[in-house]
Amino acid sequence: MSAAAGEDRPTRRRLLVLLPLVLFLALAALFFFRLGSGDPSRIPSALIGHPAPETNLAGVPGLLARDGKPLPGIAPADFKGAVTLVNVWASWCVPCHDEAPLLSALGEDSRIRVVGINYKDQPDNARRFLGRYGNPFAAAGVDGNGRASMEWGVYGVPETFLVGRDGRIAYKLVGPITPANLEAVLKPEIEKALAAK
């Protein structure tokens, strides 16, 4: 065996040892840059353009509407004939607290109907939450086991859906409503839905 062949083996061994590390670092860099470049609020939904799920949810016990009457739960008819903003929320959800004042302002817009799906929450906590921030909802249903939210394709709370007059989902916002996405995305989507016949 020649001296050159003996020196070649340690070099080859070093390459074989370093190859997995180099591959790992390359893949890690690829994932980091690909995941970091996307906007998580723009997660596509297979439901866009499809009818809103048939949702029947009982109302939040003891929750009152602005007129002092019990706030109704959610029924399939809630998603037809009017532009409807459906917000999936919970009192234990920190970003839901952040978006609550903006959602309350949207609830003042008489051109749209704001409906809430209370996700895996306790009724007392939901009532306290809405007592603190104001109740923007024309209807609010209890989704105690999360099944109705799954039918809407919810990944986590909060999520907001815009349903057109035709009962079809026009837009989905993943994450909280913020001043930036309210002005840049949600309000234009609402105006587009209102303009549609």
Predicted ranges, named:
Residues 131-136, 142-194:
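Thiol/disulfide oxidoreductase modules built on the thioredoxin-like
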